[in-house]
Amino acid sequence: MAEKVEEYRGCVIPKDLYYDIENQVWFKVNEDGTVTVGVTDIGQARAGKIINIRIKPPGKYVKKGKPVASLESGKWAGPVPADIEGEVVERNEKLFDKPDLINEDPYGEGWIAKLKPANLERDLQDLVTGEEAVQKLKEYIEREDVNCGEERAQISKKFYK
């Protein structure tokens, strides 16, 4: 059976997600038609410990490419763009008290928001998934010289068992 997740330089790369490579944002299409948004392992490693987050509230419509959230760490602050346009239907309230869940579990407890997509088929065409995503993320890791840390990677991989 093929692995659902790869690891490279300690960075966990789930193959079943869709990715915005340059912004290091992931998207998961859920069975109910919503899309979960989060920051990749690579993105959290580059940002450092997340200390503050702002997330658009439920009911807010987010245009393609506009921020669904913004993050702040000791060394970085920036947007989390929504490559999938739609209405925010839920946000991860846990992050307001514990924003570093993004660092600890970027693909699980550290998810940021859920969107009801306006045009999912169109928007997915601009993202990468599967082996193509793994290859492009490995290239990004090399280019930006990212190391996510082996010990933490083992914890994150358990999420996919």
UniProtKB/Swiss-Prot annotation:
GO terms for biological process: glycine decarboxylation via glycine cleavage system. Disulfide bonds: none annotated. SUPFAM superfamilies: Single hybrid motif. PROSITE patterns: BIOTINYL_LIPOYL, LIPOYL. Keywords: Lipoyl. Residues 34-116 form the Lipoyl-binding domain. Binds 1 lipoyl cofactor covalently. The modification N6-lipoyllysine is found at residue 75. The keyword Plastid does not apply. The glycine cleavage system catalyzes the degradation of glycine. The H protein shuttles the methylamine group of glycine from the P protein to the T protein. Belongs to the GcvH family. The glycine cleavage system is composed of four proteins: P, T, L and H. HAMAP family: GcvH (MF_00272). This is Glycine cleavage system H protein 2. It comes from Aquifex aeolicus (strain VF5). The gene is gcvH2.
